[in-house]
Amino acid sequence: MAEKTKTIGIMGGGQLGLMIVEQAHLLGARTLCLDPAPDAPAFALSDGHIVAAYDDAAALEELCRRSDVVTYEFENVPGSVLIPLEKKYNIPQGFRPLYDSQDRLREKDNARANGLRTPLYAAVDDEASLRAALAEIGFPAVLKTRTLGYDGHGQLVLKGEADVPRALPMLSVPCILEAFVPFDFEASIVMVSDGERVIHFPIGRNVHRDGILDLCFVPAEGIDDGLRSRMAAAGERFMKSCRYRGILAIEFFIRDGEFYFNEMAPRPHNSGHYTIEGCTTNQFRELVRFLLGLSLIHISEPTRPY
């Protein structure tokens, strides 16, 4: 008797979801996507779709009910609706990676607690706590909103006392103040874990334009074999210590041969797009293999620069 074709449910229908759909179809799976936008990119290829908000509990339950396994390509699905679903349906990555990444303070606390070096930081809720944090951290520093920040949004660099008044309007929501790291460049690593084994793709050197990733270079110039090995080992230890499963990308600041945790994303990452053509397998395929219960593939370094 032929094995039943599995359906992968995807929370999110953006370009990352589209590429998950492509790899799922190549591996013989069906796909069902949920996204608020009726013209979401992934809908063009998915076998089915649901147009609904990410906080629509009934729609998310429908997605889970109609799927054999569920993943996400968008990290701001509310925990209030996802946590109950995790207890009833097959969401192997679970809510924990999302929860840890949805709040910058919680994210930094978690990184530090699990062995990654971070810049100095402090929670900021009002002008008094901002000034107390600045007294400890000093200038320059970066004030960030704790939630819903991306691609440089919700951030303000404070170079000196004259910048403090500009920061006050941001304090209408919880914030975090971080020491500014005069980094040489940013690098990222994409990993996939099945709960026992962790594989990682080659580390990329990232270049941003207007706060948005523009280029990723692999092999990463400025990262020698020793630094590369230390970064990969730290990333793998972190993933195992947190007991994360599925896919995880970590961005690091590189400064004088050392690396500092910046942020993480529990989904495919834009800096990992080169893996589609540059490696023996790619980040989307390995996520799908994990979701389908297939063994992860050994990854080789690119044979030429990407």
Task: Please tell me what each predicted stretch does.
Residues 191, 258-268:
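A short beta-strand motif that forms the metal-chelation/ATP-contact edge
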Residues 95-156:
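A conserved helix-loop-beta module that forms one wall/lid of the active-site cleft
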Residues 265-279:
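Glycine-rich phosphate/pyrophosphate-binding beta-alpha loops
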Residues 154, 158-250, 254-256:
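Internal nucleotide-binding/catalytic subdomain
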Residues 49-53, 122-125, 158-159:
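Short acidic-hydrophobic, aromatic-tinged amphipathic segments that line or gate anion-handling sites
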Residues 297-306:
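Single conserved hydrophobic/aromatic residue that forms the stacking wall/gate
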Residues 1-102, 106, 128:
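ATP-binding N-terminal substructure of ATP-dependent carboxylate-amine bond-forming enzymes
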